[in-house]
Amino acid sequence: MNKNSFQITNIKNVLFFGTSKIFKKFIEINNKYNLNTEIFTSKDQSKNINKDIKHKIINKIDKNFENYISKNYQPENTLFFSLGSRWIFKKNFIKFCKGNLVNFHGARLPQDAGGGSFSWRIMKNDRINNLLIHSVTPKIDNGQIIYYKKKLFPK
C-alpha cells in the first residue's frame, strides 16, 4: 500500500455506493460546491438510509449500470465513493471509473483489511480507531492510501 497524492481535476459529480448515517451532510457539502450527487445502495442497506434521502437500489454493478453512468455522468469528472458497500468492485468497473473510485475504511490497513474489521478489533481489544480513504484496486483494501487519521478509543 502506498501513501501518495490523489487528485481529480474538474470534479462535477460524486456517486456514493453503500450506506452512511451522514449522507445528508455529504449532500449539503456537495450542493455547496455545485456537485451532482447520487446514491446507489443494495436493498438491505437501503433500510439504513433516511427515507427523505433520494437513492437508487441496484442489485449488481454490471454493463447496464455502467451504461446508466455513462449516459448521466462523465466518469473522468466523477468521484465514485464506497461507504460500506456490499459490492466487491471488479477490474472492469474499476477501470471504467478512470481511477476515481475510492473506499472509506474505518480501520487500519493492512492490519484490518476486509470485512469485519470492527469485530476483529473488539476481539483483539485494539483501541486504535482509524478513518481511512484509499483508492480501489482489484485486490481488496490494497489501494493507495489517500487520507488517514488515527484516534484512540477511550478505555
PLM regions: where:
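One-carbon transfer enzymes
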Residues: M1-K155
